């Protein structure tokens, strides 16, 4: 059990992240987090000002993990193959870590989204760099990145809410075929 003396903001955010991984954002509360850390709820205010700030920190933690994961999955690939690996990595992360639907819907309720937006733009930067290397037209690459991210995130949400009945492999194959069509048509 954690003690007040050993608490830090990092410890509080790590425990909150663990709770969200296990039970989702709806399970995250000051009272539950304090119980998990074996402290009084008011003790948490020293480390995180309010539940929204805590949610932001957890979202940023997940986005950092997603960015690192996607980067690791595209190493050694280029062009369309790297884009397909990126899409697969986002979908796999959403299926096994935290659904992007949960993350994005919680983000929608946050009053100050600047840090979250910056992380999402950092995530978007990976396919942007890949596509810019393929295209001499800046506008073309920008539009393709927007379409790609919309396709990936929309597809992840479609799966997350249970509207896709296939296996994960089938989902990845379907997403990849749609991305290939998009990349070929541009």
What are the residue ranges of the model-derived segments?
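Alpha-helical DNA-contacting segments of helix-turn-helix folds
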Residues: 54-62, 104, 112-120
